[in-house]
């Protein structure tokens, strides 16, 4: 009855067969939020809300309408603790998309320069720290969270790190 009450998010990974049927690849197939308002059966009482689902045609995890439309108690709870996000789903969504763009750029860059160290914990931590430093700097300087400016400055930082090469080796 209460086994899911202490759980916020469930991430499910399963092996997925390739089109030829001969191979399997492990994929995250869903990211599901666990709501807290149910009493007896979370399945019958809409206690589970999918935020992302795997699409086998695109071989990608895709956002659901629930996530896009801000129907996430967890994200709203986190946002309520950030002055610029509280009650402003558009600002929250812009920040989610900014972070997604940064992660995508890191993956694409690591692939392009054939350096998987860009995706390892050490560089990811440095990248996140720089993202937060730039975000704070932009907010202080312009009094708004300008996601385009933040991305531009972060991307310039990334280019400098790649030129230094030894910064992630």
Model-derived features: positions:
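Conserved P-loop NTPase
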Residues: 8-102
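Terminal-proximal interaction/regulatory segments of ATP-powered molecular machines
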Residues: 87, 91-169
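Amphipathic alpha-helical transducer elements in NTP-driven molecular machines
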Residues: 1-4, 25
């Amino acid at each position: 009855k209460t086994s899911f009450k202490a759980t916020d998010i469930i991430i499910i990974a399963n092996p997925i067969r390739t089109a030829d049927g001969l191979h399997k690849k492990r994929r995250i197939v869903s990211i599901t939020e666990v709501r807290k308002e149910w009493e007896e059966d979370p399945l019958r009482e809409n206690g589970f809300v999918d935020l992302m689902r795997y699409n086998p045609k695109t071989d990608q995890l895709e956002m659901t309408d629930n996530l896009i439309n801000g129907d996430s108690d967890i994200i709203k709870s986190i946002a309520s603790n950030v002055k610029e996000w509280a009650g402003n789903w558009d600002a929250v969504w812009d920040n989610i998309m900014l972070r997604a763009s940064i992660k995508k750029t890191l993956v694409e860059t690591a692939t392009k320069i054939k350096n998987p160290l860009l995706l390892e914990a050490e560089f990811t931590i440095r990248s996140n720290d720089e993202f937060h430093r730039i975000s704070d700097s932009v907010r202080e300087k312009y009094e708004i969270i300008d996601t385009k400016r933040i991305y531009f400055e972060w991307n310039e930082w990334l280019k400098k790190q790649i030129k230094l090469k030894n910064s992630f080796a």
